[in-house]
Amino acid sequence: MLLSIRLQPEAEEDILRNLLWWAGHHSTDEALEWQRVVQKQITQISLNPDSYPLSIENDAFPYEIRDALIGKGKRGSYRAVFTVTDDTVVVLRVLGASQGQLGPVDVRHP
């Protein structure tokens, strides 16, 4: 069953911040390609969200959170942190894979 996707405002801000980083450190074309790839990969989460591993921070949250490695290249260098509510995949944050761990104060409750 294909679930709908909703990005929390923080996830949208993360994507914009990373897009601007790509544009500043690579090129506008590279940044737009990164955005296209990431949006496609986020959409693919909805096909089988339970196939993604629990986030390392999962135990700190009152609801289940999972990670999808995303981005250009064979191994995504970003992670989409998400949860599933009813029939919706809620993307909480989109972070660089090397960024620190999240706590409940870093995300908006879905």
Go through each PLM region and give its residues.
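Basic, Lys/Arg-enriched alpha-helical interface segments
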Residues: 1-67, 102, 110
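Enriched for short, Lys/Arg-rich terminal
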Residues: 70-110
